[in-house]
Curated annotation (Swiss-Prot):
Record GO cellular component, one term: early endosome membrane
Protein name stated in the entry: Membrane magnesium transporter
Provenance organism: Arabidopsis thaliana
Transmembrane segments: 3-23, 41-61
Pfam entry (one): MMgT
Entries under InterPro entries matching the protein: MMgT
């Protein structure tokens, strides 16, 4: 496994723990009949660390970018088939007359 993948998994685990801690904290506040204003500072720090780890993993895990060669056979455009029996040009745009007001 790649290091970026492991860091990403660890970041997701930290984010899920922060979500669980926030839900648990809100439940505790409901029991104590207090109002929820914001999550505790340790949950906010977990969110920031987890987000940073996930972003770092997302940028490093895919690998290096490959160059695109213009003469490569894989870069050819997809052309329409020569058999035009399956092409249908019957659509709502035909109802509107074309406006040809060309001024040069």
């Amino acid at each position: 496994m790649n290091l970026g993948f492991l860091v990403g998994v660890f970041g997701v685990l930290i984010l899920s723990h922060a979500a669980y801690s926030t839900i648990q904290y809100r439940g505790l506040l409901k029991i104590m009949e207090e109002e929820f204003s914001r999550p505790p500072i340790n949950v906010i720090l977990e969110l920031i660390i987890g987000l940073a780890l996930c972003m770092w993993a997302a940028l490093t895990f895919p690998g290096k970018f490959l160059s695109i060669h213009p003469d490569s056979d894989e870069n050819r455009a997809v052309f329409l088939p020569d058999n035009s029996d399956f092409m249908i040009f019957n659509h709502r745009g035909r109802l509107f007359p074309p406006q040809i007001d060309m001024k040069f």
